[in-house]
Structure formats: structure tokens, C-alpha cells
């Protein structure tokens, strides 16, 4: 069953899709609040009553982890509500599309794999241009990226030519790319016709007379124990300790104050990452977390820093996991499974940014950010790893440890609502 705020989004979105063929919209919900489950219920309703159990669904994501999570959610919903035996088609990695009959199928595809397949096989492109009911894009804030944008427009245009325009549904906790006015932000809003649906806080407050009224989505869900509340515990390191020049400090400040995706100079990042005093303080805190059995996801400054911290943990007989972009998928899954196992001694997962999306572990007790973060998207994704509350299998409170560089960003409420003013609400 859906919770009231999920049901309300489902009701509003289905009503919107029924008003016009080929309607497009984006669902904006916090990480851990059930975006995927809500989308699956929407698919079930539309497939049964609007698509007459015909045609097929296309679910797109950028990573294998996201696709596997989506399949698990679909199976759970379909087991209880499905009107017919839908066929699951996997299209990523070693999985290929073989059956030409797509009627009654839901295709879970990586964007890279689907695009490569459609380029080399004209017949596949013709097949997918017939009977496509709805395209769902998980983590859709990435949709403006050139290749993804081209793929979506190609699918929408081809189906338009064939006479039936599919609906387009985006899912994200961060409905923007950079600072709101960037070209990619504009492309994102245009792709979804500037339509964004989220949690109706005013309506939900009326459903909860026993609670004091919440001012925003995050506060509402925290009061309901759906999201966890953060206990902030910063590590304060002075500029003198980092031994940065005035020019380097100014570079960081300008990057942190920028509305866009301005990055801190890589040489400065390396200098920060190699600072012995800084790393000593970080490791002392990690030792303490591990000794207390606190499940921690650690975001390093760069790849070299991640390897250094992981090696130091290992040398001190701490069972940590290291996950980088180059990590083999089988080894990555093994480490993630070990981390998720509460009986395992693996309490710390070290990465740079790989685990910002496609990683779902309700048992995270601590998010540790050691790098200067200049992107509101990246920052939101990082803190989102630990935001799942007790009603969603997580914790009532989550520790958030940041180095002082990241404190220029506001709290989780500010981060979630950052892009609202750029959309037609």
C-alpha cells in the first residue's frame, strides 16, 4: 500500500496524464521517501486502465544498481496489483534483448546499452517505436546530458511519427543540474514540459492533526519517521593547518559560493587530500566510528585519497570496503552486501562519488563527507544516502560528519528545495 503523500502524487499525476496524450512530468521526492514505489503504482494503474494491458513500458537508469532496485520494486507491486503476467526484460551489461514481441513487457534498460543497441540495429528501433506506453527515467536530473537527451528525444519523436506519443515520467530528489539558469537546467525543464509534482505539505498537514504543522517536505517526513534527522558533527580544520595560500583559499570560497558547478582546482584538492594533520583527524574519527559499530559511508577527496584512507584503515585491522569507478561489478556487489549485513564486521565503505546514486542501504548510521563539495546536486545526493527513516527500514537519526569546507551549504531542507523557484509549481 502507498502512504498518503505517495497516493496523492499518484492521483494527481494519473489525472494529469489523462488530460492529454503524451503528457510529460517529473516527480520530485526526497531520497528514501518512496519515489520508485510510487512510480510502480502509477505504471500499474495506467497499464491496467489506460493502456488496456497492451503495449510495453521502458524504465531507464544510468546504473545496474538502480535497475536491480527498480526490478525488485516492480515485482513487489506487481505481485499484489498486477492485472496480467508482465514480462521483465533486462537490458544492461551482459543482458540483451532477444524477443521481438514486446507486448506486455517492461524493459529495464541502461541508457548506454539501449542507445548502443538502437544505433546498430534499425529493426530494434522500429520495434521500440511501436506500442511504447510510457518512458520512466530514474535519476532524471541526468537527462540533459547530451547522449541521454538525444535518446529520449529520438524515442519521443519516432513514437510521435508512428501516431502514439508515450508519456514521459522523471524521478529525482534533485530537479536540476547546476545553478538553475544553466543551459542544462533549462533543457531539463523543457524535456518535462516544466511540470514538477511533489509532496503537498499543506494537504498532508491536514491529515496529521496530532502533529504540529510542518513547513516543508523534509520536516514533514522527519516528523513521520519516514526520513531520519541529521546530527551534524563537523571536523573543523583551519586554513593554517591546510597550508593553503590566500589565492587557493579564495578559489575554494568562490567555488562554494557559485550557483553553478564550478569545481575546486584539482591541485588544491590534492593538496587538501595529502595533508597529514587533516587525514590524522579523519582517521581518528573513522577509528571511533568503527569501534562503535557505526555503519559509515565515507566520501573521499579524490581517488588517491580514497585509496590512502582505505589502506590506513586496513593497516589498522579495520574491515573497510573501497568502491571506485574502476571496481568490478561483482566485487562491488560483494562489498555492498557485506556492508548491508548488520552481522558483518564491514562498517565503513570508502568511495569518491560512485555511491551517490544507485546505492540503497537503510542501515547507514553515518555519512562522512571529507571533500570540498561545490555542487548542490552532489551534496544532496551524498546526504541522501543516510536519510532513510525508521518507517522505511532506516534510523531515526543519522550522524553527518563534514569537514569545514562543506558548511557553506544549508541543511537538508534547503538542499531539497533549492530548485523549486525555477519550476512552474
Model regions: which residues?
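Conserved helicase ATPase core of P-loop NTP-dependent helicases/translocases
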Residues: 96-99, 297, 307-308, 318-355
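Walker A/P-loop
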Residues: 20-44
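A short beta-strand element within the Helicase C-terminal
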Residues: 132, 347-351, 355-373, 378-385, ...
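Conserved Walker A/P-loop ATP-binding site and its immediately adjacent core
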Residues: 33-38, 53-76, 301-304
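Interdomain helical connector at the RecA1-RecA2 junction of SF1/SF2 helicase-like NTPases
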Residues: 3, 181-294
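SF2 helicase catalytic motif II
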Residues: 111-113, 125-170, 175-177
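Conserved pre-motif I regulatory segment
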Residues: 1-28
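A conserved SF2-helicase RecA2
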Residues: 219-228, 377-380, 388-425
Amino acid at each position: 500500500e502507498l502512504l498518503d503523500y505517495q497516493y496523492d502524487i499518484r492521483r494527481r499525476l494519473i489525472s494529469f496524464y489523462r488530460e492529454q496524450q503524451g503528457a510529460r512530468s517529473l516527480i520530485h521526492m526526497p531520497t528514501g521517501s518512496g519515489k520508485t514505489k510510487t512510480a510502480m503504482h502509477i505504471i500499474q494503474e495506467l497499464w491496467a486502465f489506460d493502456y488496456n494491458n497492451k503495449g510495453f513500458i521502458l524504465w531507464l537508469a544510468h546504473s545496474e544498481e538502480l535497475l536491480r532496485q527498480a526490478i525488485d520494486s516492480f515485482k513487489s507491486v506487481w505481485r499484489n496489483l498486477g492485472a496480467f503476467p508482465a514480462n521483465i526484460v533486462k537490458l544492461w551489461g551482459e543482458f540483451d534483448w532477444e524477443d521481438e514481441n514486446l507486448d506486455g513487457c517492461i524493459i529495464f534498460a541502461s541508457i548506454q546499452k539501449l542507445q548502443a543497441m538502437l544505433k546498430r540495429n534499425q529493426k530494434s528501433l522500429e520495434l521500440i517505436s511501436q506500442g511504447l506506453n510510457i518512458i520512466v527515467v530514474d535519476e532524471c536530473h541526468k537527462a540533459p546530458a547530451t547522449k541521454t537527451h538525444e535518446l529520449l528525444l529520438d524515442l519521443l519523436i519516432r513514437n510521435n511519427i508512428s501516431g502514439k506519443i508515450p508519456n514521459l515520467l522523471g524521478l529525482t530528489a534533485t530537479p536540476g543540474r547546476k545553478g538553475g539558469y544553466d543551459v542544462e537546467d533549462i533543457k531539463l525543464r523543457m524535456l518535462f514540459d516544466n511540470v514538477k509534482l511533489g509532496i503537498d505539505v499543506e494537504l498532508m498537514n491536514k491529515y496529521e492533526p496530532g502533529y504540529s504543522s510542518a513547513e516543508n517536505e523534509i520536516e514533514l517526513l522527519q516528523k513521520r519517521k519516514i526520513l531520519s534527522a541529521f546530527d551534524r558533527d563537523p571536523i573543523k580544520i583551519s586554513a593554517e593547518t591546510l597550508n593553503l595560500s590566500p589565492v587557493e583559499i579564495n578559489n575554494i570560497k568562490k567555488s562554494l559560493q557559485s550557483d553553478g558547478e564550478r569545481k575546486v582546482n584539482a591541485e588544491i584538492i590534492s593538496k587538501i587530500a595529502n595533508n597529514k594533520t587533516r587525514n590524522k583527524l579523519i582517521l581518528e574519527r573513522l577509528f571511533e566510528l568503527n569501534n562503535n559499530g557505526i555503519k559509515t559511508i565515507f566520501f573521499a577527496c579524490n581517488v588517491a585519497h580514497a585509496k590512502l584512507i582505505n589502506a590506513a584503515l586496513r593497516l589498522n585491522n579495520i574491515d573497510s570496503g573501497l568502491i571506485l569507478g574502476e571496481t568490478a561489478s561483482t566485487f562491488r556487489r560483494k562489498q555492498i552486501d557485506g556492508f548491508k549485513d548488520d552481522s558483518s564486521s564491514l562498517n565503513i565503505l570508502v568511495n569518491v562519488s560512485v555511491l551517490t546514486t544507485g546505492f540503497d542501504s537503510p542501515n547507514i548510521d553515518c555519512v562522512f563527507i571529507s571533500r570540498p563539495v561545490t555542487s548542490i546536486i552532489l551534496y544532496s545526493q551524498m546526504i541522501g544516502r543516510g536519510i532513510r527513516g525508521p518507517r522505511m527500514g532506516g534510523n531515526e537519526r543519522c550522524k553527518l560528519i563534514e569537514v569545514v569546507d562543506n558548511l557553506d551549504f544549508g541543511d537538508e531542507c534547503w538542499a531539497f528545495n533549492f530548485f523549486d523557484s525555477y519550476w512552474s509549481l
